[in-house]
Amino acid sequence: MIKNDIWIGEMASKGMISPFEATLIRRVNDAPVISFGLSSYGYDLRLSANDFRIFRHIPGTVVDPKNFTPDNLEPAKLHQDQFGEYFILPAHSYGLGVALERISVPNNVTVICIGKSTYARIGLIANLTPAEAGWRGNLTLEFSNSSSADCRVYAKDRKSVV
């Protein structure tokens, strides 16, 4: 069953999402943002500005999912201009960040996170692991830039929907 905004709002008041925006925010200080907050059947999470790491190829190495080492992940610089704070994800690259919001999933619900079309249109694909019943914390957000151009990944703006 997909939960609606009323249920999400009630659960947020009990600590399910923090910080919580009770409405879908599309503008901040009269400037457009990639929306975040509560929508009809979901909640748009934001990427934290605290840490974003980009996968870099190290010649002679092979990435092994059974023996992963973070040596291939390097911190990305946080940029800022009139459009907001952002990281640059190089073409055909992969990045990891963390959600600004902390979630506390109820013990009888599993949360599914999906990417948003705003980013998919520019080739930025979000791959997020479901948060299982009872899980607590800040979700790791995974982004793949499938385009041939570098992409901005905005911090504190919408990234995925829970």
Locations of the language-model features?
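DUTPase catalytic domain/fold
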Residues: 1-162
